[in-house]
């Protein structure tokens, strides 16, 4: 509701539902997608959380969780500023060819981009594509 309020406050149309687009019929169409989407068992609300729900090797994830729990709170280690981003970097570091960003990890297929957890996001971008094609 806060996103819809901000859009209305600024004179922009808002969609009736999240992960959808406004039906204003005017010159401006707005779309809102709230990460991470579904399923609800994805913890957190960042792109990193969504990506960590679709790793190429899910068996590594408990080791990453264990590592981060061991160092968090250790007086000899500085706690991660952002646990979500730190978790992605540890996941990426677990690969033979180590990328240093989420985008590079995606390019190296370290995430299962065909995973069902991405279905809503794929549908949202398909709607974007349709809107752009219809606008030409």
Identify the meaning behind each predicted range:
Residues 2-93:
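Activity-critical C-terminal alpha-helical subdomain
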Residues 1, 39, 109, 113:
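Conserved aromatic-histidine-acidic binding/catalytic patches
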Residues 82-136:
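Nucleic-acid enzyme cleavage-core boundary/entry regions
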């Amino acid at each position: 509701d806060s996103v819809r309020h901000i859009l209305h406050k600024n004179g922009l149309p808002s969609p009736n539902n999240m992960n959808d687009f406004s039906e204003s019929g005017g010159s401006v169409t707005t779309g809102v997608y709230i990460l991470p989407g579904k399923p609800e068992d994805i913890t957190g609300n960042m792109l990193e959380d969504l990506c960590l729900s679709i790793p190429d090797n899910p068996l590594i994830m408990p080791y990453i969780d264990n590592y981060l729990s061991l160092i968090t709170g250790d007086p000899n280690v500085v706690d991660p500023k952002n646990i979500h981003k730190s978790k992605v970097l540890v996941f990426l570091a677990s690969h033979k060819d180590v990328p240093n960003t989420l985008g590079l990890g995606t390019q190296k297929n370290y995430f299962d981009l065909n995973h069902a957890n991405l279905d809503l996001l794929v549908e949202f971008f398909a709607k974007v594509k349709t809107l752009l094609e219809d606008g030409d």
